[in-house]
């Protein structure tokens, strides 16, 4: 405070003659200061008035001829800091706060030896604090907040012994805090928040006995809370939040009896909250959020009689809220979200009548909302989502007249919605509960309601009248209920911005009135039963940005008026019955980033007007009947970087025109598709040569041109495509040779499929030595020469190749011992060639081999002893050679390694012919028996279900394989069959009528899942048993019988507590059904995806249990029996949770048994985006190591809470694996764990160990990944917390 003498001098100044001003140096400096002003003159008008003496200028105070105070606070001068300030040697007070000064502070400030008050806050000052500033020994207040000052705080600050206020927050000052600060015994306020100070707080700070306010928040400080804190008995406020302090809260904290504000949140503090904290009678605000506190909340908290605000969120308490909290009569805010709380909400909280905010979200609270809460009439916000609360939503909630936001989502509330006559209510969320009944017509008595979230419930009825009075409603989400009727047109009269009605039973036509809305930006009506055409009036909704009407029954053409939706960025009409041509008007929607019209019946050409979509980065027109050529303008939208509003990052750069009837050549303008990453043109009638211009698309990661009519060379360009991982050119008419330098052209190729062409020449030796290649298929060509398994330089080499098929060519020569370099091979198929010589003993070294076919060659000699001992080998064929052993069945004879075995070299052709006749006769008998058995079983099944079904999806005319033989390349394989003896218990015999009744004619009400191979319905069988019925997609035998038989073979053989058991099946006509045990708690994905704005977050013990259990299930598939099973689609949505949250691996719709019964090659994508291992590209090969990668992604989901792909992971390339690597590379490992996951020190160590295993599982190179047995072993060690180095070894224990 300025002394009285100072104001006396101000009074006397008026008696000084004006003529004396001219003699003052300060006056001259004032004119210099004025002349430097270029901005803000309007705020300083009298400075430029010649009649006004300088000492009367605004903000200027003089004593005699001397300027003693300059206060230009908030005057927008926006200029470099004035250098002339140092000339005002009599200056006592200087306030330039909020003036917009920039640049560094001048050393001349040290000349102001009389300065007592300095405020330069809210400017744009840079550089260090001048050393000369520490010479201002009269200084009492130094305020430098909100600048960009840098450097360190000098120990010279100890010279400012009169300092009472030091505020340097919101800068970039770094380094450690100088202990010399502790000598400033007059200091009352110390504010250093939001800098980058590091190290610990010096113990000397305990000498600041006058300190009232201390704020060191948002720095990088470490260590424990400094021991001298208990000496600061005058302290009123203490904020140490957002640092890295460790240890416990000292019990001596209770000695700070004057403390009114204590903020220690967002640190690494551990242990219990001390009982002594209850001694702080004056405390009004207590923040302990985002630490690692454990144990119980102390009962002594009731002693905080002045407390108004308590935040203990994001901790690891394992206790109930103490009932003593009911004694906090002044409490207005209780925030304890994600704090590890359990038990019931204490009814005593109803005594805290002043409570306005209660946030207990994401805990494990149970029971109903206490009746006593009805008296909390001051409530404004009530958040309890993500618990296990049950009962009805109480009707007395209408007493909360001041309530603005109520969030009850992700609980187990049941019954109807309550009456809500709350005039101030803005937001009501009760999603993901068990609410039933219809939406009451009085819902809009809350006439201020802006947001209503009721998705994922069991609501029924219609909404014909429900929302008519909601005149302020901007967001309505009814996703996944059982609401039926038509979409009402009155919704257009509401101020809705977002309308989400997907996954209900809405039927009828789209209302023409809906498109009259002036506000709707997002509409999603997917997965309903909406019929009829898309109305012409759709074009009236010109502000619309996202429109999703996929998977309905819409028919007719796409209307021309869609072109009036000029703001549209995302349009999905996928999976309807739309016909006609793609309208030219659609291309007036020039903001489109994603356009998906796939799986319709569209015809005609792809219009050249597509060039208007310059922001397009995802175009999906697959599975239609489009014809004509690919327009030269197709690439215009792919010339630019990805649009920021693109919905799915994994779809960026996707150009998919597959499975149409396109003809002609790929246009040379394809070179302009610079941003295309995935190019799918398979399944068309394209011809000509592969354009050399493809070699200019350096961002390509995969190309699929299979099943077309291309001719000419397979690789017409010579420059490298360094990003390309998948190249699939099978089933064309390509000729010529494979370039000798293919390894340089495709340096990172992982999947290369050149099968079923007319290629000639040799197989380049360098191709097999590519460091990235793991799938190579050159079968059914005219290749010749030797297959070189050694590298050109002759050096020893460990290949990463997993799959090699060179069958049905003209290869000759022998197999040499260098094949031992290919230890990762799981499939080796060289049948139907002209190989000669003996089998190399190195074949026994291929320990990963599970499929071996060397049949129909000219090989001779003995079988290497170790062949039959390869653990995973489930199929081997040596027939058609001069070798006794034809298949693995011959291993049972046990004589192939004996010293007195047959002399295979001397085997006469006569014996070979005789043996062939014998085998053919035996095979003929077996085939007859199998055919008769199949006929018998089919007739028996058909009799049990005479009813015919309509196929789930219409068969499309494509160039895909139409039979098993065609898919397998007419290889000799065992027939697909169902071995009913493999099932442990008798299967349920379910009739078609049972299924129709249980699913109400396949009503969408019963849908609980929809995968690539089938839709899953929740149903109750006649005897009352709840089951899940999977209706397999498929309109022909390859897509129906094959998946059905594979599923039966797979699940029937598998019995494990962590796998979903198959209960029965049903066959009728083209329809195939599987009946599974119903899993009460849904999928892991459902529990992980949503948190503060969605579903409940699982605690770490639950996540670790789920991780270990699902690993055991997958390990059993890989190693539990022969033949081994590959899942092919391992993901969080395929891990189901029973009533005890025990995990069960589900959905073997993509499973393949690697045996003679089935191929392991597929032309479809195996897996789901985000889970597919990098070696797949557009994979046609599945391996156990691919499953391991996918499971590693699931582990990362459990650790981080993030989805496998999305906007959040943009730093890592749009996927979770990349983001985790990006975070770890920057030393941010502790920041990648799920922020909604409270952890103790033990849990943190467990999480770090699981992260290490997950990183091994998601290694780019398959051979670096562990087996699932090793994963189980590592997780078991982690679960038991055997401390010390983590050593993962193979264990047979699952």
UniProtKB/Swiss-Prot annotation:
Residues given in the record as ATP binding sites: 1008-1016, 1030
Protein kinase domain location is 1002-1282
Q: What is its main location?
A: membrane
Q: Which reaction does it catalyse?
A: L-seryl-[protein] + ATP = O-phospho-L-seryl-[protein] + ADP + H(+); L-threonyl-[protein] + ATP = O-phospho-L-threonyl-[protein] + ADP + H(+)
The subcellular location is:
Cell membrane
* Family per similarity comment: Belongs to the protein kinase superfamily. Ser/Thr protein kinase family.
UniProt protein name: Leucine-rich repeat receptor protein kinase MSP1
This protein's species is Oryza sativa subsp. japonica (Rice)
């Amino acid at each position: 405070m300025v002394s009285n003498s100072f104001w006396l001098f101000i009074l006397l100044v008026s008696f000084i003659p004006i003529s004396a001003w001219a003699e003052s140096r300060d006056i001259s400096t004032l004119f210099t200061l004025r002349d430097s002003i270029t901005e803000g003159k309007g705020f300083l008008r009298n400075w430029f008035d010649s009649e006004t003496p300088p000492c009367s200028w605004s903000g200027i105070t003089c004593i005699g001829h001397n300027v003693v105070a300059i206060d230009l606070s908030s005057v927008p001068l926006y200029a470099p800091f004035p250098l002339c300030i140092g000339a005002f040697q009599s200056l006592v007070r200087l306030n330039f706060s909020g003036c917009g000064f920039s640049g560094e502070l001048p050393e001349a400030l040290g000349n102001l030896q009389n300065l007592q008050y300095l405020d330069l806050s809210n400017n744009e000052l840079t550089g260090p604090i001048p050393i000369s500033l520490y010479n201002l020994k009269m200084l009492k207040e130094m305020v430098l907040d909100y600048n960009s000052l840098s450097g360190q705080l000098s120990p010279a600050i100890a010279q400012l012994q009169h300092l009472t206020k030091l505020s340097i927050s919101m800068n970039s000052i770094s380094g450690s805090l100088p202990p010399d600060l502790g000598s400033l015994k007059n200091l009352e306020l110390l504010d250093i928040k939001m800098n980058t100070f590091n190290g610990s707080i010096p113990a000397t700070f305990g000498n600041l006995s006058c300190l009232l306010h201390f704020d060191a928040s948002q720095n990088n400080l470490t260590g424990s809370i400094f021991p001298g804190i208990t000496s600061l008995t005058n302290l009123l406020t203490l904020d140490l939040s957002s640092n890295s302090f460790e240890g416990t809260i000292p019990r001596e904290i209770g000695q700070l009896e004057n403390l009114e504000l204590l903020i220690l949140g967002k640190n690494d503090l551990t242990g219990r909250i001390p009982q002594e904290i209850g001694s702080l009678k004056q405390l009004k605000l207590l923040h302990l959020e985002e630490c690692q506190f454990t144990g119980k909340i102390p009962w002594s908290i009731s002693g905080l009689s002045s407390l108004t605000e308590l935040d203990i969120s994001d901790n690891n308490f394992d206790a109930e809220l103490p009932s003593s909290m009911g004694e906090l009569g002044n409490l207005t805010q209780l925030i304890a979200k994600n704090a590890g709380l359990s038990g019931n909400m204490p009814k005593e909280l109803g005594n805290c009548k002043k409570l306005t905010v209660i946030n207990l979200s994401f805990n494990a609270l149970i029971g109903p909302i206490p009746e006593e809460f009805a008296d909390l009439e001051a409530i404004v916000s009530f958040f309890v989502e993500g618990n296990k609360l049950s009962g009805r939503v109480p009707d007395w909630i209408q007493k909360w007249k001041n309530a603005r936001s109520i969030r009850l989502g992700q609980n187990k509330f049941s019954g109807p919605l309550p009456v809500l006559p709350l005039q101030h209510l803005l937001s009501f969320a009760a999603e993901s509960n068990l609410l039933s009944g219809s939406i009451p017509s009085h819902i809009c008595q809350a006439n201020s309601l802006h947001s209503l979230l009721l998705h994922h419930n069991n609501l029924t009825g219609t909404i014909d009248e429900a929302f008519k009075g909601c005149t302020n409603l901007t967001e309505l989400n009814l996703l996944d209920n059982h609401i039926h009727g038509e979409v009402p047109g009155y919704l257009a009269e509401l101020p809705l911005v977002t309308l989400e009605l997907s996954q209900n039973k809405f039927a009828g036509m789209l209302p023409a009135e809906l498109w009259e809305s002036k506000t709707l930006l997002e509409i999603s009506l997917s997965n309903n039963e909406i019929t009829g055409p898309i109305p012409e009036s759709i074009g009236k909704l010109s502000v619309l940005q996202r429109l999703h009407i996929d998977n309905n029954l819409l028919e007719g053409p796409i209307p021309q008026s869609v072109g009036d939706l000029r703001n549209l960025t995302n349009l999905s009409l996928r999976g309807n019955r739309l016909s006609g041509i793609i309208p030219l008007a659609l291309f007036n929607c020039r903001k489109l980033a994603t356009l998906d019209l796939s799986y319709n019946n569209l015809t005609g050409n792809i219009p050249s007007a597509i060039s208007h979509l310059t922001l397009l980065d995802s175009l999906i027109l697959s599975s239609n009947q489009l014809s004509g050529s690919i327009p030269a303008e197709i690439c215009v939208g792919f010339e630019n970087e990805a649009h920021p509003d693109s919905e799915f990052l994994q779809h960026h750069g996707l150009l998919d025109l597959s499975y149409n009837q396109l003809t002609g050549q790929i246009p040379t303008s394809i070179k302009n598709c610079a941003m295309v990453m995935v190019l799918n043109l398979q399944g068309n009638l394209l011809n000509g040569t592969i354009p050399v211009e493809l070699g200019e698309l350096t961002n390509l990661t995969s190309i699929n041109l299979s099943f077309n009519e291309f001719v000419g060379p397979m690789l017409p360009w010579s420059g490298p495509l360094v990003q390309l991982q998948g190249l699939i050119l099978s089933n064309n008419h390509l000729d010529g040779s494979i370039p000798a330098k293919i390894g340089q052209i495709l340096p990172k190729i992982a999947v290369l499929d050149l099968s079923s062409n007319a290629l000639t020449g040799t197989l380049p030796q360098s191709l097999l030595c590519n460091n990235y290649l793991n799938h190579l298929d050159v079968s059914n060509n005219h290749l010749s020469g030797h297959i070189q398994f050694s590298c050109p330089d002759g050096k020893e080499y460990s290949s990463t190749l997993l799959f090699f098929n060179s069958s049905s060519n003209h290869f000759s020569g022998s197999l040499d011992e260098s094949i031992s370099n290919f230890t990762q091979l799981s499939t080796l198929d060289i049948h139907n060639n002209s190989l000669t010589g003996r089998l190399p003993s190195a074949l026994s070294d291929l320990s990963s081999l599970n499929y071996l076919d060397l049949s129909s060659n000219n090989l001779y000699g003995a079988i290497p002893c170790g062949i039959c001992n390869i653990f995973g080998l489930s199929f081997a064929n040596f027939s058609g050679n001069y070798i006794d052993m034809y298949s693995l069945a011959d291993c049972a004879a046990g004589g192939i390694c004996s010293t007195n075995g047959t002399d295979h070299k001397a085997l006469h052709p006569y014996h070979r012919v005789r043996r062939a006749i014998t085998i053919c006769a035996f095979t003929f008998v077996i085939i007859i028996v199998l055919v008769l058995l199949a006929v018998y079983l089919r007739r028996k099944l058909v009799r049990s279900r005479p009813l015919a079904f309509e196929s789930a999806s219409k068969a499309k005319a494509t160039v895909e394989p139409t039979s098993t033989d065609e898919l397998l390349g007419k290889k000799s394989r065992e027939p697909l069959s169902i071995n009913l003896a493999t099932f442990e218990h008798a299967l349920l015999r379910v009739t078609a009528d049972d299924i129709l009744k249980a699913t109400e004619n396949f009503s969408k009400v019963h849908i609980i899942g929809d995968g690539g191979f089938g839709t899953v319905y929740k149903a109750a069988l006649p005897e009352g048993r709840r089951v899940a019925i999977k209706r397999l997609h498929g309109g022909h035998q390859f897509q129906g019988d094959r998946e059905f038989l594979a599923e039966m073979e797979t699940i029937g053989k598998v019995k494990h507590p962590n796998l979903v058991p198959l209960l029965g099946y049903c066959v009728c006509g083209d329809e195939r059904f599987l009946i599974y045990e119903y899993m009460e708690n849904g999928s892991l994905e459902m529990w992980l995806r949503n948190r503060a704005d969605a579903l409940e977050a699982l605690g770490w013990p639950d996540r670790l249990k789920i991780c270990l259990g699902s690993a055991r299930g997958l390990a059993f598939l890989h190693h539990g029996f022969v033949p081994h099973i590959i899942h092919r689609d391992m993901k969080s949505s395929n891990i189901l949770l029973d009533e005890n949250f025990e995990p069960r691996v589900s959905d073997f719709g993509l499973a393949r048994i690697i045996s003679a019964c089935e191929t392991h090659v597929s032309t479809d994508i195996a897996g789901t985006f985000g889970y597919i291992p990098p070696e797949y590209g557009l994979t046609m090969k599945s391996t156990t190591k691919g499953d391991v990668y996918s499971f590693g992604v699931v582990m990362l989901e459990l650790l981080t809470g993030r989805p496998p792909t999305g906007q959040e992971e943009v730093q890592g390339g749009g996927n979770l694996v990349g983001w985790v690597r990006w975070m770890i590379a920057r030393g941010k490992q502790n920041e990648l764990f799920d922020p909604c996951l409270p952890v103790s020190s033990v849990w943190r160590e467990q999480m770090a160990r699981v992260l290490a295993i997950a990183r091994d599982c998601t290694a780019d190179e398959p051979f670096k990944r562990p087996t699932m047995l090793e994963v189980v072993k590592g997780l078991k060690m982690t679960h038991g917390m055997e401390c010390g180095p983590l050593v993962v070894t193979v264990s047979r224990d699952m």
